[in-house]
């Protein structure tokens, strides 16, 4: 047990020294973070770019007052470069970040063939200015997420319209004259419940025979909702890898003309007329260009999990060191697997 050896100042009774001090707390502490950051700036890129695919994914991650810019090999799933900012990124920050990566490629004689990003307006001009006329693909998942959100919102609007048509009665059992209206009210209420419980069927990509039967049942008497489902089927067909970009753009033009004939749908599906949808079809002409930015999003999700399970108070240097440690861990993953496999084989005899 620790014993006091210093005279307490004043009347507060504070301990100024101890004959047996306890070790420092290691909560939220991880070895090697500072050294990891130094190694990332020295020799990590040489190994990471040794099998560079030529395709990258770029994205930004917001962590409180900080923002993390990341570039990941979109086919090898390796984080290549990152930068921690203490403010929201601007076009100048994106330009400087991309120039750092372009200098690293030029120093090793490598060329970039394609970039995948989200729909942020900060990327297009910076990509053209730094990398030249490379293929720029917008993430397919971001585009589909906006469209599915609009369709779900349209289904909710139909539910509200049905709720407004419900007849109102006084308390108690309906009279003989209102029995038919009461039965219709009960049927409409059940349809509203079904539309809510099965709303995912309007945006799900593939439907089973049972799900198709359910969809036909809950949309009986609601042709607008059946049209919404048909439009979603056409949207999914746009991203079929068997098509070329020109073919998909022709399909998109026909789909837009069809939607324009419905005044209500034209307003609801405004995202269908966004130019970002056309940029999301660039990957159809290049079989190696990934359609999504899942490679960089995966690292962002792991960072979010680390926020919840490892540390709470974050500083800019701490975030940078943690990311560097994770990058080194990924770089050593293959070696750890080979070591584990060798030990298992040796143990098995």
Residue spans of the language-model regions?
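Short hydrophobic/aromatic segments of transmembrane alpha-helices and their interfaces
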Residues: 8, 46, 283-284
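Alpha-helix initiation and N-capping motif
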Residues: 5, 22, 140-144, 155, ...
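Short, solvent-exposed secondary-structure capping/transition elements
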Residues: 80, 153-160, 208, 336
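Conserved beta-strand -> loop -> alpha-helix junction used to position metal-binding or nucleic-acid-contacting
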Residues: 115-121, 126-170
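Acidic/histidine-rich catalytic cores and adjacent linkers
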Residues: 106, 110, 117-125, 131, ...
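Alpha-helix boundary/capping detector
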Residues: 34, 38, 51, 55, ...
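Extended interfacial segments that mediate partner engagement and assembly in macromolecular machines
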Residues: 1-5, 9
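RNase H-like nuclease fold core
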Residues: 4-5, 14-133, 153-154, 295
């Amino acid at each position: 047990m620790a014993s006091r050896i210093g005279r307490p100042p004043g009347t507060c009774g504070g301990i100024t020294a101890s004959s047996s001090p306890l070790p420092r707390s290691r909560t939220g502490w991880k070895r090697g973070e500072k050294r990891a950051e130094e190694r990332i700036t020295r020799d990590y890129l040489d190994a990471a770019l040794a099998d560079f695919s030529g395709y990258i994914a770029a994205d930004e991650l917001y962590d409180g007052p900080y923002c993390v810019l990341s570039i990941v090999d979109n086919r090898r799933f390796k984080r290549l470069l990152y930068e921690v900012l203490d403010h929201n990124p601007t076009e100048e920050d994106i330009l400087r970040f991309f120039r750092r990566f372009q200098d690293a490629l030029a120093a090793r004689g490598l060329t970039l063939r394609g970039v995948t990003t989200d729909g942020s307006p900060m990327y297009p001009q910076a990509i053209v200015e730094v990398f030249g006329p490379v293929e720029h693909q917008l993430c397919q998942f971001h585009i589909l997420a906006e469209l599915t959100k609009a369709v779900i919102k349209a289904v909710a609007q139909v539910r509200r319209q049905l709720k407004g048509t419900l007849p109102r009665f006084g308390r108690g059992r309906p009279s003989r004259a209102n029995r038919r209206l009461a039965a219709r009210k009960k049927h409409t209420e059940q349809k509203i419940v079904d539309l809510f419980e099965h709303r995912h069927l309007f945006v799900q990509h593939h439907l089973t025979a049972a799900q198709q039967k359910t969809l036909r049942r809950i949309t009986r008497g609601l042709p607008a909702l059946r049209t919404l489902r048909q439009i979603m089927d056409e949207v999914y067909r746009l991203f079929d890898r068997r098509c070329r970009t020109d073919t998909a753009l022709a399909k998109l033009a026909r789909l837009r003309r069809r939607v324009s004939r419905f005044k209500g749908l034209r307003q609801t599906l405004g995202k269908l007329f966004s130019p970002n949808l056309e940029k999301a079809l660039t990957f159809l002409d290049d079989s190696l260009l990934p359609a999504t930015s899942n490679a960089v999003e995966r690292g962002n999700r792991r960072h979010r999990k680390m926020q919840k399970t490892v540390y709470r108070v974050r500083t800019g240097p701490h975030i940078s060191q943690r990311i560097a440690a994770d990058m080194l861990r990924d770089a050593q993953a293959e070696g750890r697997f080979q070591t584990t496999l060798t030990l298992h084989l040796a143990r098995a005899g």
